[in-house]
Amino acid sequence: IAVYENETPLLVRNISHTVEELSVYSQVVDQFEFRKNLVLQELEANKIPFDFDAVIGRGGLVKPIPGGVYEVNEAMKRDTVHAMRTHACNLGGLIADKLASSLPNCRAFIADPGVVDELEDIARITGSPLMPKITIWHALNQKAIARRFAREQGTQYEDLDLIICHLGGGISTAVPRHGRAI
């Protein structure tokens, strides 16, 4: 969880969950209230007023879309609940929407979900028409790192050709050309 006032961080915390805590839930979607309440508890414990202009959550495994920031809507929520794969990231937009909906004039967003699809046609070839290319990668992290690197180099992400690897809870590699992972 992170709370910013403009570009100033007011709170940055990583909330971890034990296997035992999560084992009481048969499906990831059942963890919704648990995870939402932890966010609210963290805000309260740090005396952060529940008064926001926008709430952004980690994007889920919705239908493939280009990279960017998206406002949470009913179709996205439906796709997230009935996603092609089960992952905790599917709760990010749902939690953001629930929190935002309790505040006047507050909007909910996701950014660069793991299904960002910017592949060129040649990259879709798998060797068999029975095995279509499914694009799932750590887009949020990789694009953020690429943008930071570009700033440090005094240039724009869109002007660079890179190879980026995410080595965290999962592993993925992307080859962005001019700001689009191909």
Locations of the language-model features?
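Short, conserved beta-strand segments within well-ordered enzyme catalytic domains
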Residues: 2, 54-56, 109
